[in-house]
């Protein structure tokens, strides 16, 4: 099954401006979060690949919206540029932030946004700002806690409680992920992909 998933995923396009966004012919789920929170690693884990999505140790390397086609374009995974730290210049940052905003608000085939939060640092102000923006624009989202293997269960529980209290919406699910904790990946993958049906 894992090999089948990998063979049915292809990188199709990296959009650096509004005009270059691909057509809206397939349902999409998008992954957002602070720079270096693990979006590309999560996508690789979901599709059982080590290199489909480029992973960098330097924050702010993804500067375009990357689209991955699943099962002959039955649906797509979308890797959004990280918010926060970036090596890009001010004008370039403004350009891709405008691109992200346009994509999230205008994309008719967008089914769900998964907001990734680093469990080591918890919910930061910049995460709150982004989530508040999603809420104000009526954009459906869930939360994904990354790097859960690097914190204690007590600390993880405190982070989850803090997020639940701040969002205060029982319809927003909180998922737990780590590239080193793979035994629950099938269940999580099914949970993510159900939004594309």
Curated annotation (Swiss-Prot):
Q: Which cysteines are joined by disulfide bonds?
A: none
Q: Which cofactor does it need?
A: Mg(2+)
The keyword GTP-binding belongs to this UniProt entry's keyword annotation: yes
Residue ranges constituting the EngB-type G domain according to the UniProt record? 25-197
Tell me yes or no: is GTP-binding among this UniProt entry's keywords: yes
**SUPFAM superfamilies listed in its UniProt record:** P-loop containing nucleoside triphosphate hydrolases
User: Which positions in this protein are listed as binding Mg(2+)?
Assistant: 40, 62
Pfam families reported for this sequence? MMR_HSR1
User: What GO molecular function terms would the record report?
Assistant: GTP binding; metal ion binding
PROSITE patterns xref list: G_ENGB
BP terms from Gene Ontology: division septum assembly
Annotated signal sequence is none
Could you say which residues bind GTP here?
Answer: 33-40, 60-64, 79-82, 146-149, 177-179
Query: What Gene3D superfamilies has UniProt attached to this entry?
Result: P-loop containing nucleotide triphosphate hydrolases (3.40.50.300)
**What are the entry keywords?**
Cell cycle, Cell division, GTP-binding, Magnesium, Metal-binding, Nucleotide-binding, Septation
- Report the superkingdom from the record: Bacteria
Record-stated family: Belongs to the TRAFAC class TrmE-Era-EngA-EngB-Septin-like GTPase superfamily. EngB GTPase family.
Record function comment: Necessary for normal cell division and for the maintenance of normal septation.
- Which HAMAP family did the record assign? GTPase_EngB (MF_00321)
Q: What is this protein called?
A: Probable GTP-binding protein EngB
């Amino acid at each position: 099954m894992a090999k089948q998933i990998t063979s049915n995923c292809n990188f199709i396009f990296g959009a650096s401006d509004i005009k270059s966004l691909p057509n809206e012919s397939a349902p999409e789920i998008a992954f957002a979060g602070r720079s270096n929170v693990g979006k590309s690693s999560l996508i690789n884990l979901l599709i059982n690949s080590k290199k489909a999505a480029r992973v960098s140790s330097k924050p702010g390397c993804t500067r375009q919206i990357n689209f991955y086609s699943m099962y002959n374009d039955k649906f797509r995974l979308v890797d959004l540029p990280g918010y926060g730290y970036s090596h890009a210049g001010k004008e370039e940052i403004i350009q891709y932030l405008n691109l992200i905003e346009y994509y999230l608000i205008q994309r008719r085939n967008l089914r769900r946004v998964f907001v990734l939060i680093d469990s080591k640092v918890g919910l930061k102000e910049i995460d709150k700002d982004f989530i508040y923006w999603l809420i104000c624009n009526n954009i459906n989202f869930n939360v994904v806690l990354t790097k859960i293997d690097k914190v204690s269960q007590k600390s993880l529980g405190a982070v989850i409680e803090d997020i639940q209290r701040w969002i205060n919406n029982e319809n927003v699910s909180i998922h737990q992920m780590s590239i080193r904790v793979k035994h629950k990946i099938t269940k999580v993958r099914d949970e993510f992909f159900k939004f594309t049906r």
